């Protein structure tokens, strides 16, 4: 199906969805799209739901996409997976585009890959402010060249200000611009007992990019000031085994973990 804000279910609020399998789904359109749900909120539970297919949300307006869910505002997503190639402008995740502070993701996986034109692309989640545990991503993550905004691209999550524990990323990251990492592009939260295996390729011409095997930028903005104020990101018991291949060596940052 295609159009604006397209998913199988639209807004899921204080509801339970279990044991749904979507095979070879093809979703195209503008604004916010995914295979299963547009937004999950309230005391909702999404459990044992799985999807395969393609999602394409490239548009000047919106362009947010998730392999299974676009927004997890609150509630839980447990034991779900997506083998969906996900393409969009911003907030692009192989499983979920954006997880807000009251969202919980456990025992989930994504393998289809996530590709953005502007910012915040991750193999599992594009942007995370909630809690993610025991979850894994194995798809390739990439960000195309874009003249206005280009940052935060990670093998597991693009931008993190939440909590991530016991997670892994295995796909390569190909990027232009700032904050590319094998696991996380920009970390302003807490990441513990997690690892990544993929290589990071930074194609940025000239100074201005930042790339590293695990975390592209940890708790600091491009000017080096702490963000949020006096609350740097934390990395505990994390490691990376991949290589970092950069066009300009000035863009290599110091968070290989």
Placement of each model-derived feature along the sequence:
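Predominantly extracellular beta-rich ligand-binding scaffolds that present long acidic/polar faces
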Residues: 1-257
